[in-house]
Amino acid sequence: CIRDRYKVLSTVFANITPIKNLTIRTQFGADYSHSTAFMQSYPSYVINNGMGSAGRNSSDVLTLSETTTANYRWELNESHSLNFLLGQEAVNFESTGFQVVSRGQANDKLTNVTSGTRASAWGDSNSSYSYLSFFFRGEYNYKDLYYAEMAARTDASSRFGKDHRWGVFWSLGFMWNIKNESFLKDVEWLTSAQIALSTGTSGNSEIPNYDHLALVAGGPNYNDEAGIYPKQPGNEDLGWEQTWANNVG
């Protein structure tokens, strides 16, 4: 079997600071991979009984992404520190591929796919999905003693029906850095002491790309004649799996 693979990754970004403490960043990314494979089995092999085979497949995968964020930092009297992040992200994934195997090659020097007498396996595929997200995060720090963080985001996935495409998720967190309190700051044997609390939700959309759609498929299904048959019923009520987690540490 002969395989060929190559992959191309690229990222382009730009940062601007329109006013003091505000940074706006836009980033575009592309991830492309291509692979091919060729296999052959010579007719001279004993187990082939004088009938060779050859196959070829090819696949292409492309992921495009775009992220834009606005980050604002603000400090007051070296005691209060605030950090706000507002952002948007879009991801688009596409993959295509095909394969074909033929049999009946009669000569070891003619074992390409077209030298076969019949195709024994074939197929092609095309799949895609996309995401669109908007998110916010706010952080507060008081004298490196008390920390608070809140975050919220909404995500849309093409894997779900139009009425369940969007999911909303959030989180809250608090932390007390006890080691920096005056009564512990000079205790040398204690290097770190913190109490943290957090709660929030997260989402999962890892299902096949078209499970929400009613699909039909075709092929030589009726006495080797072409036909169409129902492949899956679809379910427009599919939506985000949501998990709520609480942590104390």
Label every PLM stretch briefly.
Residues 3-41, 51-249:
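Extracellular/periplasmic, surface-exposed regions of secreted and cell-surface proteins
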